């Protein structure tokens, strides 16, 4: 069976209830959502480091189980 996957890019600095609402809605349409955290070392740092954002997202999306994957990219 083919897995339906969505990519949700953003800075997530920090993740908000609005982000979580979009994730819930997306998971009603696809099997997996990849949260792609954007960062740019050439710009001033935001509120949280990439590692802190990843940890926050892991904590608040734990209930979604393996339907959520978190990655980061430079952009």
Residue ranges and their predicted role:
Residues 1-75:
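Nucleotidyltransferase catalytic core that binds NTPs
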């Amino acid at each position: 069976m083919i897995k339906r996957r969505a990519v949700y890019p953003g800075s997530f600095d920090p993740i908000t209830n609005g982000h979580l609402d979009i994730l819930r809605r997306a998971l009603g349409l696809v099997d997996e959502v990849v949260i792609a955290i954007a960062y740019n070392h050439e710009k001033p740092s935001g509120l949280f480091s990439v590692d802190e954002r990843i940890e926050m997202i892991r904590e608040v999306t734990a209930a979604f189980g393996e339907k959520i994957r978190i990655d980061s990219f430079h952009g």
